[in-house]
Amino acid sequence: MNVERVVDHSAIRTNQVFTITLLALAFVLAAPAISGITGASMLLSAAAPPLGLFTRMYRHLLRPAGIIQPRVVPDNPEPHRFAQLVGGVMVTLGTLLVLAGVTAIGWALVLVVIMLASLNLFAGWCAGCTMYYWFNRLGVPGFSRSRSEAAR
């Protein structure tokens, strides 16, 4: 049985907007608490997408109010979850480095996540998704979905 796999790209874009906004605010205000909460939310979203703070705001507030319309397309969710995991790890590590006094490297990691999320939001290129599909092509265990499966 061939079950179509779909992803709501509006939910992903909403996550990116919240991530970019909160991380930029954390950087400008030099507020590692904000980046820490954002990183934790990203990690939770990667582990259990329905529980992610930004996903919940989209599903229970923004979408029902008609502020954002769903855009459900054939796609694999795993690469997006992997990208969220990579971003969450980088933000969390960056936050811990800032708290440990290694501020330049810590904030640099946060800024990299801002740049990559912006690249995905504005240009449609997901670095974490690309990494996922590379790992799939290399046969790395756990990276079982190929790009062609999303198009079926």
Where are the model-predicted features located?
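Membrane-interfacial helix-loop segments of redox and metal-homeostasis proteins
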Residues: 1-152
